[in-house]
Amino acid sequence: MDNKLTKDIRIPVSLCDHTGHLDIPGFFTIFMDMASEHATDINIGMDNLGEKGLIWLAVKSKFRFYSKPKMFSTVTATTWPAEPARIRADRLYKMEQDGQLIAEGKNEWAIFHPESGKLVKFAEVYPADFIHWDEIVCEGRYAKLKDNFDDAEEIGRYTVASGDLDTSRHMNNVEYLKVIFSAFTSLQLEEMNVAEVDITYKNQCYEGEELILKRKISEDGCEIGIIKADGTAGAIAKITLR
């Protein structure tokens, strides 16, 4: 049982922006796909949990970006789980090109039992003989993001479509990032030198829901709230610029 998954990936057109480089949601897409694959390899994937009536629940993410690889160039991406706490666990990620670190990240996960509405202890489903890879990347705490966007600027609206859903029939984690970055014009994106993205998932969003995107400007970037019709936040992101 491999305690990490490493892949050489040729950057596809479908994950690139108009400049011909891997876009920010593209980084997330690669990493989340690898996380799902590796979880399956170590017998804690979506299908494995589904047999027990459980699902993975993304809580929050932090990713740092140092350069964006060009379309059709090759990168080496790696993911591995950190040793879990009682009901929360981090999964770690890094991407390298020509021996240089170009992105690193982590996200916090929980295991959820939808029928009871409770979180499940990792010890109940985690392989007891698993030996963890001990490398640490993306050090530092997750951002503490508040969901008060009452006075924030509205920058767009989005209706959750069928193509945004995951197997649990709520909005896929990566789709939140796609919605956020699609709210900016191509010129704005060119001017944004993104150093770090934090995102906290607050409430699940479902097909047909209209979401309001609100922005609060800060000295080093901005915070984006994805706000549901009832005023609660679906997700909150902090974009830190260089």
Feature map (PLM): residue ranges:
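Hot-dog-fold acyl-thioester-processing enzymes
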Residues: 1-58, 104-108, 113-193
